[in-house]
Amino acid sequence: MKNNIILEGFMGSGKTTVGIRLSYKLFMTVVDTDKLIEKEQGMTVSEIFEKEGEEAFRKLETACLQKLLDEGNKQIISLGGGTPIREENRELLKKLGIVVYLRVKPQTVYDRIKNDTSRPLLQCENPLQRICDMMFARKEAYESTADIIIDTDELSFDEIINLIRDAVEQYEKDRGISL
């Protein structure tokens, strides 16, 4: 297993912001898989979805994870919200490092991203219902991949970061490993 901390969770769960702040606290590099894909493809995630479709984007996520597995170490990796839905991605994530699931309630997600037009999967008539449906469909994938689960709804970013740091330290201690 690589010495990375991987942040997974639904869109709007705080993965990107937590990843950046956690990287400062732990003196680790932060990598956002969506940003890597956008840079490599020369398009935003929304544009990839629109032009190529979701399945093409999911394949790009798999290729990105494989590249990180081949090259990356001692990083905070912030995933796209749908990355764990593919079985092959879940297998790669387990090899990449410690997976932390930032769990959040549907209403919290909706409140955070209701005005964000860059979320292609939420451009629909009833975004809150879509969030509920998608979270239900992804729940098992998130939970089966996670080594650590943090419920983030009522927490500040500093509280989340401290919980992650403490949980990762305990995880390492319990397994005799070290990042």
Label each residue range with its predicted role.
Residues 2, 21, 25, 98, ...:
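NTP-dependent small-molecule kinase module
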Residues 16:
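Walker A/P-loop
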Residues 81-83, 105-107, 155:
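Short glycine-rich anion-binding loops that position phosphate/pyrophosphate groups of nucleotides
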